[in-house]
């Protein structure tokens, strides 16, 4: 397999015991991601995260972030039609008094948003599949490498 790794930053954003996820679609398939996206050349991880949060959920100010709190490799299996390798660098955002009920997106790839209770994540198709980590993570926890996790 020969796939150049792509770096993706994202943020765990919790509000009233729930976590915000962005809905994406591929033909015949719906899946969810933490808000975030790709890092451009010459852009710091935190700058990329702030840019992506503005695009995907409309938070235009410099949201305070913790982390990174986790790193995940998503490497497509050898038998996959297209080689793919994404390195996910996950931060956590401090929303302060902001509400996530009126989230808006400027990104055409985002088909919607939803707040999920941490106990509801098991039935969600999440890329990468980090439901267990999200349900256990607490602010101040040490950063962890979650290994190679792939969700087709």
Role assignments for model-derived ranges:
Residues 1-34, 46, 61, 95:
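N-terminal strand-loop-strand
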Residues 4-6, 12, 21, 82, ...:
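Intrinsically disordered, low-complexity sequence elements enriched in Ser/Thr/Gly/Pro
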Residues 29-32, 105-152:
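Nudix hydrolase/Nudix homology domain
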Residues 39-64, 72-126:
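Unchanged
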């Amino acid at each position: 397999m020969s796939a150049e790794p792509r770096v993706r930053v994202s943020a765990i954003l919790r509000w009233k015991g729930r976590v915000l996820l962005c809905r994406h679609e591929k033909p015949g398939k719906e899946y969810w991601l933490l808000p975030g996206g790709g890092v451009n050349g010459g852009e710091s991880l935190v700058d990329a995260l702030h840019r992506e949060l503005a695009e995907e959920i409309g938070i235009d100010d410099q949201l305070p972030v913790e982390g990174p709190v986790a790193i995940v490799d998503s490497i497509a299996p050898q038998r996959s039609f297209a080689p793919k390798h994404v390195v996910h660098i996950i931060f956590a955002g401090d929303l302060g008094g902001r509400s996530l009920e009126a989230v808006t997106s400027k990104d055409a790839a985002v088909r919607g948003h939803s707040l999920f209770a941490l106990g509801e994540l098991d039935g969600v198709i999440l890329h990468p599949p980090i439901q267990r980590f999200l349900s256990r993570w607490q602010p101040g926890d040490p950063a962890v490498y979650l290994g190679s996790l792939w969700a087709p």
